[in-house]
Amino acid sequence: MWSFSKKTTIAASGILSGAADHHSHILPGVDDGVETMEESLHILATYEDLGIKELWLTPHIMEDIPNTPQKLATRFEKLKAAYKGNITLHLAAEYMIDNNLCKLLQETPPRFRGEVVEDRRGEKSPAEATMGEGDRTPKQDPPHLLPIGTAGKHILVETSYFNPPMKFRETLRQIKSLGYYPLLAHPERYMYMDNDEYRRLREEGVKFQLNIVSLAGGYGKTVKKKALWLLENGFYSVAGSDLHCEDAIEYITKCKLSKQHIELLKQLLQNKI
């Protein structure tokens, strides 16, 4: 039993037991993450040793990496066939807010007829406000998007770290109009965002995903400070590793946190969306 009076490592705290990782680049050979099946399987074995029970594979989809749901699903099936362990694997994607995503959204039918996505002020997105309760039946169209979460109601998105996209707010509204919640990956890493912007986004119904590496200082002191503020003030819904290679696992497990931050991170690792 370890004492909460001092900082302890994430590994020693035991909070990874039963955890869900909501952001990773472990699907091999599809983006800038893991390249080989062998490396993917080795990482999964290490995850098992740490007690992680659920993993979302979220490869990039952007103009420079134009993956498709069909291509990723094929690769995902190969990984599932090769993996014999106990971690539950899910396929989603991390979408850059760019022209490629705007085009995909224009081609995507609403997730549910009449699905209502509200912001924290209770305001419905315009396209959904006109739909009735009786129309809320699932669409069965071929997938245009790869949502994240067991209910399939969230789209993991990212932006440039330095500048907001030209159609940032418009794209977020369009995601909501299709019956999804935007889940913003690693908001602490965006240099152009401040606390007021985080508050505005939360009020508009955007949810946040923490990169655990940010708490370890892996992206610098400024990012760590922002991550701790967001964590302490309850902005995050879930957490993820954003793992691109095996070396990052040790960086995460050796991260030392206070009792308060360990408890807050534990909750995020147990959360479902």
List each model region and its residues.
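Active-site neighborhood of phospho(di)ester-bond hydrolases with catalytic His/Asp-centered motifs
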Residues: A20-H22, W56-T58, H90-A93, L183-A185, ...
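Mid-to-C-terminal alpha-helical segments outside catalytic/metal-binding sites
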Residues: E128, T253-I273
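Short acidic/histidine-rich active-site segments
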Residues: Y236-Y251
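Short histidine/acidic/glycine/proline-rich micro-motifs that form metal-
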Residues: D31, I61-D64, Y161-F162, E188-Y190, ...
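A structural motif
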Residues: I52, F235-Y236
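Non-catalytic positions within long, well-ordered alpha-helices that form the structural scaffold/packing
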Residues: E48, K176, L231-E232
